[in-house]
From Swiss-Prot:
Role summary: Involved in the catabolism of homogentisate (2,5-dihydroxyphenylacetate or 2,5-OH-PhAc), a central intermediate in the degradation of phenylalanine and tyrosine. Catalyzes the oxidative ring cleavage of the aromatic ring of homogentisate to yield maleylacetoacetate.
Cofactor(s) the protein needs: Fe cation
Enzyme class: oxidoreductase
Family: Belongs to the homogentisate dioxygenase family.
Assembly: Hexamer; dimer of trimers.
Catalysed reactions listed for this entry: homogentisate + O2 = 4-maleylacetoacetate + H(+)
Name of the protein described by the UniProt record: Homogentisate 1,2-dioxygenase
Residues reported in the UniProt entry to bind Fe cation: 341, 347, 377
Keyword annotations of the record: Dioxygenase, Iron, Metal-binding, Oxidoreductase, Phenylalanine catabolism, Tyrosine catabolism
Lineage top rank: taxon: Bacteria
């Protein structure tokens, strides 16, 4: 049996965020009433995949039991991966991470490769903080690829991968089932889960936030109430699907920012059944229930929070994943675009589609920007002038857009690649230089 990644999946999904799921590709493959029977059905092996400590509080504990044809331990020893090593996982000062400038930074899109390049080969680290070895912080990668992975499988031991496609669909076959993901959707692949990526549209480009720390979860809603923002039912987890395929395959592992490879004589996507709450999932950003002001002022961007990774300090997150989707603006006598801002947190932004309402030009789909701790940022001169003169007695719909932000509590440090690449816009600062002085002490 082989998983067919040449066409869209036909199986449905399991609905809900971090639910206790149970799914089997063969009837009766899940053991009844126990996790590790003396003999599992169909001659399968029982294997637990733990995403948190055994003793983590029940509400935060993540693990799944897999029933597979061969255990994950069956492969040859790892050796260094011979391909390009453009990944960084430790963001202390080094040759890969030079001193971080306080400048506002912006990049054009990562160009499509000129040679055949798959998802793994197309990864490059732009920025990050903390350390994968310390299981703290994150790495922000871009990917640009034009070839499906061929008999190659990948996993990251460093963190969970929040994937934001910008161009091209991704058919992602994982150990626990298949996710078909398109632009305007996101996928999250847990730490350690093995997968392969097919590119049905040829070229593919996007963003990844690799979370080294506490697992992503839905935010509390506070006074919003019991509904709103990203609703749990809209998160989709794959049903069990497996392949029983033998041959010469390659398993690529990411550990402490380095890529390693091992020969493996079978497809590792051989999980026939599984149950638990540690599994990949996807979410359609177009289903986000946007909250906003219906009186005056522009609320803080925390109202656009989709997922976050928490810290031990209440209200202070290690990572916030925020989106700026289509929405109505109705606030009267209010400057409606995002305001001028300096932030104790650091903000890495990307654009999936359209235009961002705080930047008239220069910030394009596939591009990125970085505004670090206390770096002044906000609307450009043209946006400010137009918004200051607009008629706010009438609602206005911000349409044809999907921007997002990875916001972190600690400094986001750009890599040497990010600071030296030709995609860096050296003239980004000029978008604010045309802002005129309006101050007149004689006229209020």
């Amino acid at each position: 049996m082989t998983l067919d990644l040449s066409k869209p999946a036909t199986a449905g999904y399991l609905s809900g965020f971090a639910n206790e799921f149970a799914t089997e590709a063969l009837p009766g493959a899940l053991p009844h009433g126990r996790n590790s029977p003396q003999r599992a059905p169909y001659g399968l092996y029982a294997e637990q995949l733990s995403g948190t400590a055994f003793t983590a509080p029940r509400g935060h504990n993540r693990r799944s039991w897999l029933y597979r044809i061969r255990p994950a331990a069956v492969h040859r020893p790892f050796e260094p991966f011979a391909g390009a090593q453009r990944l960084v996982s430790d963001f202390a000062d080094s040759a890969d991470v030079p001193p971080t400038p306080p400048n506002q930074l912006r990049w054009n899109p990562l160009p499509m490769p000129s040679e055949p390049t798959d998802f793994v080969e197309g990864l490059v680290t732009m920025a990050g903080n903390g350390s994968a070895a310390a299981m703290s912080g994150c790495a922000i990668h871009l990917y640009a690829a034009n070839r499906s992975m061929r008999d190659r499988f990948f996993y990251s031991a460093d963190g969970e991968l929040l994937i934001v496609p910008q161009q091209g669909r991704l058919f992602i076959a994982t150990e626990l089932g298949r996710l078909d993901v398109e632009p305007f959707e996101i996928a999250v692949i847990p730490r350690g889960v093995r997968f392969t990526v097919a590119l049905p549209d040829g070229d593919a480009r996007g963003y990844i936030c690799e979370n080294f720390g506490a697992l992503l979860r839905l935010p509390d809603l506070g006074p919003i109430g019991s509904n709103g923002l990203a609703n749990p039912r809209d998160f989709l987890t794959p049903q069990a699907a497996y392949e029983d395929r033998e041959g010469a395959f390659e398993l690529v592992a990411k550990l402490n920012g380095r890529l390693w490879r091992a020969d493996i004589g079978h497809s590792p996507l051989d999980v026939v059944a599984w149950h638990g709450n540690y599994a990949p999932y996807k979410y359609d950003l177009r289903l986000f229930n946007t909250i906003g002001s219906i009186s005056f002022d522009h609320p803080d961007p925390s109202i656009f929070l989709v997922l976050h990774s928490q810290t031990d300090t209440p209200g202070v997150d290690a990572i916030d994943f925020v989106i700026f989707p289509p929405r109505w603006l109705a606030a009267e006598d209010t400057f409606r675009p995002p305001w001028f801002h300096r932030n104790v947190a650091s903000e890495f932004m990307g654009l999936v589609h359209g235009a961002y309402d705080a930047k008239a030009e220069g910030f394009v789909p596939g591009g990125a920007s970085l505004h670090n701790c206390m770096s002044g940022h906000g609307p450009d001169a043209d946006t400010f002038e137009k918004a200051s003169a607009s008629d706010t007695t009438k609602p206005h719909k911000v349409d044809n857009t999907m921007a997002f932000m990875f916001e972190t509590r600690t400094l986001i440090r750009p890599t040497r690649y990010a600071l030296d690449t030709a995609q860096l816009q050296a003239n980004y600062f000029e978008c604010w230089q045309g802002i005129r002085k309006h101050f007149n002490p004689e006229q209020r």
